[in-house]
């Protein structure tokens, strides 16, 4: 996906600390860009709307939870 990321409004969870976390930006075509707030110079990961919705469904249902060791 070749997406223009200039001028995007990035945000993170209000529950996150100042130490850094994941930031997302909504894309005009409906997807999202995801980046690490500690290394904003790296190219963000870009997901279309369907990919992002599938991720959210999986995260909310516990599908992608790591096992407790």
Residue positions per predicted region:
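Positively charged, low-complexity terminal tracts
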Residues: 1-69
């Amino acid at each position: 996906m070749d997406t223009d990321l200039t001028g995007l409004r990035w945000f993170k969870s209000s529950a996150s600390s100042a130490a850094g976390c994941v930031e997302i930006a909504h894309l005009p075509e409906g997807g999202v860009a995801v980046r690490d707030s500690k290394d904003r110079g790296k190219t963000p990961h870009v997901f279309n709307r369907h990919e992002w919705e599938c991720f959210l469904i999986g995260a909310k249902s516990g599908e992608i939870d790591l096992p407790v060791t």
